[in-house]
């Protein structure tokens, strides 16, 4: 019998959307499945319907979440209720614990689904004598916040999820090393329609009228995902973060923190107009890794997110052209987004979830590039095998309605861009530190033998 640690949907109707409010539950049926708490249809404040259309979700009916909060909190083991500056997770032990649940026909417990409350991967240790690879970082007890995200009970920082770990490990160990990315962009047909339409616009039209016409002519924008399954929770986090970034940057929604205006607010009234297609994307921002001389101890440093900008323009034939640089307002906004990202990630958890996904991608790429599993002589059939844990399968995001905005120069604009995670360039750079060997030894002494976590 296979184990299915899944989440049973509770349907709540709010603002015209059918939202899937998922609570901790389990049912037994093949294939092996470990869908994670928090991988609901509405992720990061966006909803994707059966046709792949992405829309902004609202969570007015918070009463449905109250039961999930209670169940999730009650499921925390007593020894995980305290903040842990360095929680160690044995990948071998985790894989074996999942297999035991499968063999016994038991659901996966919340502590496995939430990876013990781990919030960041700071170290990766290899123990050849124990045939093990260990992930280590800060952790704390968790809760479900009002946005439906699983976050630390005291810090509010999102926790890492088993589902995303499995997705990242399998992506890094594929036959081809690919970049993980998502992009939301106008279609080529839509751009041609708009280019043809705007040639007939007469001067002096109301800018809002022009913006509405631009939205109609462009039609739905395409959503593309590479490197991970487009139906995965990992992919949904990327798309949701991209959508939220553009909503804030274009001024459709205010930032949930002070000091982050929209890019529209940064366009000087007397300056040249900004590009009609600003392109913003989010990327990892890491320092070079640290390693010991033997390559058995690794420290992942930095671990933040940066916003990048470039200005695109539409030529007369309706083709999008890259300028190779950003207009001043777009670049200034990207700089502010980067500076305020940590605060934004606390106020809007999807940005913290994206940072977690980047952490998992870097750790997984490191394990693959340095052959750490081979060094430890360990296999992880449940985490990495095709017959092991089956990750969440959500409606794949395919398109989203175009939204145009009017600048202070009365010019209609529409944003494009996405998320780009290239962990391979990050793990190519490492510096050697003799101090890491002692950290690895201490971590081994503190971790109880035979357990998947300390």
Regions found by a protein language model. Name each.
Residues 12-27:
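Bacterial N-terminal signal peptides
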Residues 1, 17-19, 35:
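Extended, solvent-exposed polar beta/coil surface segments
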Residues 4-7, 28-29, 75, 421:
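Selective for proline/serine-rich intrinsically disordered segments
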Residues 1-13:
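N-terminal secretory signal peptides that target proteins for export/translocation
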Residues 26-34:
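Signal peptide processing junction and immediate N-terminal pro/mature segment
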Residues 8, 19, 388-391:
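Polar low-complexity intrinsically disordered regions enriched in Ser/Thr and small residues
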Residues 33-454:
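Outer membrane pore-forming secretion/assembly proteins and partners of Gram-negative envelopes
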């Amino acid at each position: 019998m296979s184990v299915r640690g899944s989440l049973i949907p509770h349907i709540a109707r709010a603002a015209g959307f059918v939202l899937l409010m998922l609570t901790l539950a389990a049912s037994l049926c093949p294939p092996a499945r470990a869908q994670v708490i928090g991988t609901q249809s509405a992720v990061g404040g966006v909803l994707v319907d059966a046709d792949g259309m992405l829309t902004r979700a609202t969570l007015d009916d918070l009463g449905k979440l109250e039961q999930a909060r209670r169940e999730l909190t009650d499921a925390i083991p007593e020894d995980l209720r305290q903040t842990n500056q360095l929680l160690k997770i044995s990948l071998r032990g985790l894989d074996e614990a999942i297999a035991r649940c499968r063999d016994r026909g038991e659901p996966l417990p919340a502590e496995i689904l939430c990876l013990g409350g781990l919030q960041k991967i700071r170290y990766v240790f290899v123990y050849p004598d124990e045939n093990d690879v260990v992930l280590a970082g800060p952790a704390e007890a968790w809760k479900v916040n009002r946005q439906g995200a699983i976050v630390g009970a005291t810090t509010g920082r999102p926790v890492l999820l088993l589902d995303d770990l499995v997705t990242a490990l399998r992506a890094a160990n594929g036959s081809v090393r690919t970049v993980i990315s998502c992009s939301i962009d106008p279609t080529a047909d839509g751009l041609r329609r708009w280019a043809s339409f705007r040639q007939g616009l007469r001067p002096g039209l109301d800018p809002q009228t022009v913006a509405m016409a631009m939205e109609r002519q462009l039609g739905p924008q395409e959503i593309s995902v590479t490197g991970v399954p487009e139906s995965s929770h990992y992919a949904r986090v990327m798309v949701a973060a991209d959508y939220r970034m553009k909503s804030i940057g274009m001024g459709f929604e205010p930032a949930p923190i002070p000091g982050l205006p929209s890019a529209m607010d940064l366009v000087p009234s007397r300056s040249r107009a900004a590009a009609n297609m600003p392109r913003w994307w989010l990327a990892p921002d890491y320092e070079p890794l640290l390693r010991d001389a033997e390559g058995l101890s690794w420290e992942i440093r930095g671990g933040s997110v940066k916003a990048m900008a470039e200005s695109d323009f539409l030529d007369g034939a309706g083709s999008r052209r890259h300028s190779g640089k950003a207009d001043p307002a777009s670049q200034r906004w990207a700089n502010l987004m980067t500076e305020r990202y940590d605060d934004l990630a606390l106020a809007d958890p999807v940005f913290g979830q994206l940072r977690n996904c980047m952490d998992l991608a870097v750790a997984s790429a490191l394990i693959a590039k340095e052959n750490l599993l081979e060094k430890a002589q360990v296999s992880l059939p449940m985490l990495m095998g095709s017959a092991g844990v089956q990750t969440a399968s959500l409606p794949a995001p395919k398109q989203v309605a175009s939204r145009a905005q009017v600048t202070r120069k009365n010019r209609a604009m529409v944003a494009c861009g996405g998320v780009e995670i290239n962990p391979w360039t990050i793990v190519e750079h490492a510096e050697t530190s003799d101090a890491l060997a002692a950290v690895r030894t201490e971590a081994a002494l503190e971790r109880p033998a035979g357990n998947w976590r300390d």
